[in-house]
């Protein structure tokens, strides 16, 4: 009987632990903290779990999983580490070709411009692409003009939609030798968030409900164990008394 209660207890504990779903894994502490901050900003409770060498993982309640994935995609999380130009060309690296160095340099510039655009108020995510002539200067050929394009997703109701000229001016002053007409900026307003899965009601108190069920089950188990113990203990005592009475009768 005790074994049956033990199995039931373990089953309930397992089901209670399955309420959270893994959202992200293998994050460093800074990435995990930023993900937690964004989710909490949108009223989604998230847990950060330290997995040692495997990094940090983020879990959320199952009813919040759909909304959490939406906000992660919207904010392009987890964030990429900040790029420093010096990191692209370490002093102890092997000598690479001029083309490879140019490609790495422009890639770093793209990422730095993206990070700068994301600091603007209302910008949720940004992408910058540079079209450059990789063969410029070879065989005396004149370089082709550089083109810049930027795509930014902004928060609904943000005044960023009227600041395309400011963004173009920022890109123009951040990059040498690029004409203003060769810069294109596309702004996209964030779509409406689907905060719950279709047909699935949101259950904010699922964790508390699990604990209530667990407490009730433990109470029932304790009562059952008390009844079982009382019956067995009473039966043994009764048998002992009967045996003693029989022994006394035989001695007499």
Swiss-Prot record:
NCBIfam families per record: III_secr_YscJ, PRK15324.1
Entry-linked Pfam families: YscJ_FliF
Subcellular localization, as worded in the UniProt entry: Cell outer membrane
Keyword Phosphoprotein in record: no
Protein name, per record: Lipoprotein PrgK
UniProt keyword list: Cell outer membrane, Lipoprotein, Membrane, Palmitate, Protein transport, Signal, Transmembrane, Transmembrane helix, Transport, Virulence
Broad class of the protein's primary localization: membrane
């Amino acid at each position: 009987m005790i074994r049956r209660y033990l199995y039931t207890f373990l089953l309930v504990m397992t089901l209670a632990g399955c309420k959270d779903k893994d959202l992200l894994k293998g994050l460093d502490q800074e990435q995990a903290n930023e993900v937690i901050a964004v989710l909490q900003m949108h009223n989604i409770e998230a847990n950060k779990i330290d997995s040692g060498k495997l990094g940090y993982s983020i879990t959320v309640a199952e009813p919040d999983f759909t909304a959490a994935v939406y906000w992660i995609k919207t904010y392009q999380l987890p964030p990429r580490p900040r790029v420093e130009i010096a990191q692209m060309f370490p002093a102890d690296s092997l000598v690479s070709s001029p083309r490879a160095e140019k490609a790495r340099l422009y890639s770093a510039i793209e990422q730095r411009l993206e990070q700068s655009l994301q600091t603007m108020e209302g910008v949720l995510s940004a992408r910058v692409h540079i079209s450059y002539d990789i063969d410029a200067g070879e065989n005396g050929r004149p370089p082709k003009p550089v083109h810049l394009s930027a795509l930014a997703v902004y928060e609904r109701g943000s005044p960023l939609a009227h600041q395309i000229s400011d963004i173009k001016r920022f890109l123009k002053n951040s990059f040498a030798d690029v004409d203003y007409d060769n810069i294109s900026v596309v702004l996209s307003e964030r779509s409406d968030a689907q905060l719950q899965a279709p047909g699935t009601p949101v259950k904010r108190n699922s964790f508390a409900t699990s604990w209530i069920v667990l407490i009730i089950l433990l109470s029932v188990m304790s009562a059952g164990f008390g009844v079982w113990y009382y019956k067995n203990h009473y039966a043994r005592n009764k048998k002992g008394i009967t045996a003693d009475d029989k022994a006394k009768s035989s001695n007499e």
